[in-house]
Design a protein with these regions (language model features):
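Short acidic/glycine- and proline-prone juxtamembrane loop motifs at membrane-interface regions
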Residues: 136-142
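Transmembrane-helix signature of polytopic, membrane-embedded enzymes
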Residues: 109-128
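Membrane-interface alpha helices of multi-pass inner-membrane proteins
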Residues: 162-186
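Membrane-interface transmembrane helices that cradle and orient dolichyl/undecaprenyl
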Residues: 148-162
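Signature aromatic-anchored transmembrane alpha helix within multi-pass, membrane-resident enzymes
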Residues: 197-201, 316-335
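Hydrophobic/aromatic-rich transmembrane helices and adjacent perimembrane loops
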Residues: 294-310
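Alpha-helical transmembrane segments and terminal signal-anchor/GPI-anchor hydrophobic tails
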Residues: 33, 55-66, 71-80, 184-296, ...
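TM-lumen/periplasm interface segments of multi-pass membrane proteins
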Residues: 1-2, 18-101, 335-345
Length: 345
């Protein structure tokens, strides 16, 4: 039932915010009251797991509940610290969920307001794509992603020490966040579409030819490393490199890449495009380790929150761009909430 509400909420908000965005200046930013107006319902939906989890059978909810009540027995020390800090103020599990939701959603909405060209449309994209999966189910990785998105402006402004500090904090929420350090080595102020499009083609062709990038890399380190990794890989099904979600993401990336000159003035465009590229490329690159590929793809995909709204500038008639944008958002929302059933509530 809740996923139906999210879908209806996304549809209504998408149409409403698109109209509002078009009728105000592009420099439109959230006032404090507007910030709270958007924040409260999102936090409410995120906290709904507290009331619906038993009926929905949310495994993640029950795992977090057990971890919270037995923090000293949790394998991950970072989670133990977070749980004990929250338990110091209150032993209630609801406060634990509220803390994670406030950290994650507040940072995301704040970042959208500060660095998105179309903050309202970015908000719609956020609700359509990563909100249900991350803020309702994967709450630790959601906080890590929120901190990563918040730190992007420091990366672009070449304040690397601050960026490293925030990513280190993100690692405290989820160790997979260490992958975000790699973007320190990316050029932040330029994007060459031909290079990245060609790279995307080469990577997928190589995967189609069954070239195992993980094996090639681990052979340098020693065969034993690949042996253990192959055991993990054998326990999982191979990824569908051209599933519907992946195809939509490739289409959006190519659409933006071919029209990249129109977004040259948006200083965050180059780095977000490269992050989005990585979210797509990680599937064929890490296809032999499906769990790892899916995890990293999910972590990097929220970059679409800031990129998808830009498509309205591609069309000569703005209203066509808005219709196209809303259709893509509804399609992604339907795929995430119903087709793939990422949140079975």
């Amino acid at each position: 039932m809740l996923r139906s509400l999210i879908f209806v909420f996304c549809t209504a908000m998408g149409i409403f915010l698109a109209v509002v965005q078009e009728n105000y200046k592009r420099t439109l930013r959230f006032s404090f009251s507007a910030f709270v107006f958007f924040l409260v319902p999102l936090v409410f939906f995120a906290l709904s797991r507290f009331f619906w989890a038993d009926a929905a059978g949310l495994a993640d909810y029950h795992n977090y509940f057990d971890f919270f009540n037995h923090a000293d027995k949790v394998i991950e020390n970072r989670f133990e610290v977070m749980a004990k800090v929250i338990r110091f103020f209150s032993p209630t599990f609801f406060l634990f969920l509220l803390s994670y939701s406030l950290i994650s959603i507040t940072l995301k909405v704040y970042t959208i307001d500060k660095i998105s060209i179309y903050p309202l449309l970015s908000l719609v994209t956020y609700i359509s794509t990563s909100f249900a999966l991350h803020d309702i189910v994967q709450i630790r990785i959601s906080c890590a992603i929120a901190i990563f998105l918040f730190s992007i402006r420091f990366l672009v402004e070449q304040k690397y020490l601050i960026y490293v500090l925030f990513i280190s904090i993100a690692v405290c929420f989820h160790k997979s966040s260490a992958a975000f350090f790699i973007f320190l080595f990316f050029r932040k102020n330029s994007f060459h579409p031909a290079f990245w499009i060609l790279s995307l083609i080469v990577i997928h062709v190589s995967a189609f030819l069954n070239i195992n990038f993980i094996k090639l890399f681990l052979l340098v380190l020693g065969e034993d490393n690949y042996y253990y990794l192959s055991i993990i890989s054998d326990m999982n099904q191979n990824l569908d490199l051209f599933n519907v979600n992946q195809l939509i993401n490739i289409f959006i990336f190519l659409l933006l890449a071919f029209n990249s000159r129109k977004f040259i003035s948006y200083k965050f465009f180059p780095i977000f495009m490269k992050i989005f590229f990585c979210s797509i490329a990680v599937y064929p690159l890490l296809n032999s380790v499906p769990i790892v590929a899916s995890r990293f793809s999910e972590m990097l995909r929220p970059s679409i929150i800031f990129l998808l709204p830009l498509v309205i500038n591609i069309f000569r008639r703005k209203w066509v761009g808005y219709i196209f944008f809303i259709c893509i958002c509804l399609m992604l929302s339907f795929l995430n909430n119903f087709y793939y059933s990422l949140v079975s509530i």
